[in-house]
Amino acid sequence: GTFAVTGVSNTSANNAVAYMVVAGGAGGGGASRGGGGGAGGFREGRNNPITPYTASPLVTTGSTVTAQSYPITVGAGGANGTNAADGGQGSASIFSSITSAGGGQGRGNPGVAGGSGGSGGGGAGEGGTAQGTNGGAARVAPNQAGGGGGGATVAGQDGQNPYTGGAGGAGATSSINGTPTARAGGGG
């Protein structure tokens, strides 16, 4: 899709826009001890006092636009793994030059590190690394319980015991749409 700007002010500060770009989350690994999928990458920009809402702790400066069309891509989520298969990687979301990476896939096969991405996938071995937070690692012995997927603000937890996987990491809360809403949490 596109975001079309058809007219702008002569004052550059008045052409500021807030944005939030959240990528697709990843699928969790298959089997009973698969790792959780990582959250899609989360990017938010705001310009005060033009857009005075309560932003997430990850907020940066918003964008200034000109009269043109800006490309927008909304990333899809990854499919869950079946049996012992890995989950699918999330797809990137893009607004203009701002890209949020898709979430890192949760692993199903024992001993395999979680996928890298916007937030790392939970591992059936080590947790995945990320643009945001990392995924948790599996419990190694005597059996493997997968790690949780990373969230926008908190990493996924490691597997807790042979039968309890790690919790997914917390997302980020923003009121960009007028209501405090948490987004981009990791899978457990």
Protein language model regions, located:
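Glycine-biased low-complexity/repetitive sequence motifs
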Residues: G1-G188
